[in-house]
Amino acid sequence: MEKSIFMPLLLALGLSLAGLSVSAQNHSKSVYGELLGASQMIGVNYDARFNRAVPYGLGWRTGLGFGYAYSSSSAVALSFADGEMPVAYNRMFRFAVPLEINYLLGKGKSKFESGAGAIVCLDRFTSETGGAPEHSFGAIPYLSLGYRLVTDNGFLLRAGAVPLLSFSPFRVSFYPYLGFGWAF
């Protein structure tokens, strides 16, 4: 009889202690998926604070994103983040690496996030009519403004806007973003 009570109590105690250790973490690091924003269309990112003892303040972010643009007419130039697709092509594939310095303001679960960085891009332009693809490599400067929620158990929600900057010709394109992940 004692063994049948002892094991469930030991299991309950272990689960309680594990739950306390998760909620006691400072959540200064996070991994999350992102739609749009600096990931361009879809991506996965890692974010951390320079001061690992606190879940707010100055930090950095990097990741890997993927973007795609298509036009049914090769005579129409597509606008995609930092410029226009060459007229002879009607599809663009983009691999993107966002690099950002950011700041989280707030000490509770809800924080305001702001940042500045560059998206390092490798673009591949293709056409349905054939021909050799064209490649380009570059960087797009951007800002980031948004809201970040981190629950006690580590669930992370991010939402905001990323103004992308282009300099030839000068223009600002706004991309919303939505992210879900885990803070630890």
Question: What spans do the regions from the language model cover?
Answer:
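Outer-membrane beta-barrel transmembrane domain signature
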Residues: 50-57, 66-184
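N-terminal targeting signals for Sec/Tat export/insertion, comprising classic cleavable signal peptides
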Residues: 37-55
